[in-house]
Each structure stands twice: as structure tokens, then as C-alpha cells.
Amino acid sequence: VGTLKGKSFTAQFNRVDAGAGDNVFTYEGGKVDSWELSCAVDGLLTANLSMDFAKETIGAGAGVYAKATPTYPTSLVLLSFVGATVTIGGSAFDVTSASVKGDNGLKTDRYGIRATGTTKNEPLEADMREFTASFNAEFQSVAHAQRVAAATAAGALASVTLKWQTPDTLHSVQVDLPALRFDEGAVNIDGPGILDQAINCKALTPAAGGSPVTITVVTPDATA
């Protein structure tokens, strides 16, 4: 997890109107403010990005504003719940849904009074980054409730890995959270059905150092 200062991207969208006409929208100075990876039973792994841009330009032009031709990976695949595993403390844990979120803590409203040039400065980190995870599962044991109630920091932590993989193992996305603190693990009784447990956690920096979250993407493509 490094600094975001000086890092940005340009995105372009072609929005087709009711008359089947192309309308190019170009966005410059882009940064990801927050993100989420999530998946549930019967669903696909999805990524949701909240993005902030410095400038919007409508209409095709020259250079970066020219209508671009999109390119796609040669082996594009979808990852689903079928090839997913969640491991907590080294043991597999069956869940009905899982989510990992990241908030970069950016100040995106750095506006100033200026007669010339841009009136918005680059968004910078104005708060500590926060990484959280949540799981919904059938109530299987008191293990995670005990983590929430633990009297020591060590007792509340567990190493968690989430992995989505295709059957041929050529494509995968893996999220490693080496020091996940269990903050909530409510088990409520609302009827005669199987009890559910909602688990909410926060990723911490490991005591030995390193990143609180690592995302590894594997693909057979020579370039990603």
C-alpha cells in the first residue's frame, strides 16, 4: 500500500443515445476514492469503484479526446462463487456472501479561488486508509463470536484469505488479509430457521510489518 500522490488515469466512455449516435465522454485526472470486491451464492465476483476526476470533456476531439478503440484481454473470463473459497485462521469457512472494501481517505474537494488554470487541486490522502471485510454465513460455531468478545488484541485477530479461481486454475483473484480484527458477529434469533451470523471486520497492519491487504491477480495473458 503506497502513496497515491502524482498517480492518476484517464477514462473514456462512449454513450450511445436514442438515435444510435456515439457520444464520447473523456475524464482526466482520475483517482479511485474507494473500492469493493464482493460475491454471493449464485453470483459473480464483482468490483465496484468510486472514482473522482479533475475534468470532464464531452465530445470527440484530437489527442486524448479522440474516440478510442477498446481492447480486451485474449482470455477474458468471469469468476463466480463456484470456484471461491474463504479461509479464516487456516480453516475453510462456508459463507453465503463476502465483501472486502477499501477507502483511500482522499480529500476530493480541494478547490481554490484562481483566475487561470484549474480550480481543483489533486485529491490527496487526508485520512488513514481503511480496509474492511464482511461475511454472512450460517451460524456454525462460537469461534467468531469469541473473537469479537476476546479480551486481548491477539484473540480478536485472524488471518483471512478469499480466493476466486476458474476450474482450470489459469485465472484467479486472491485477497489476503493477514491481520483481520473481528468487530461484530451478531447471531440473532428471528424465527425457527437456521441461524445466520453477520461478521464485520477491520484489516490492521500485521505486527511483523507488511500490508494490511494484498490482492493477487493471476492470468495466462502475457500482458494484463
Where are these regions (language model features)?
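Signature of extracytoplasmic/envelope-associated structural regions
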Residues: 1-224
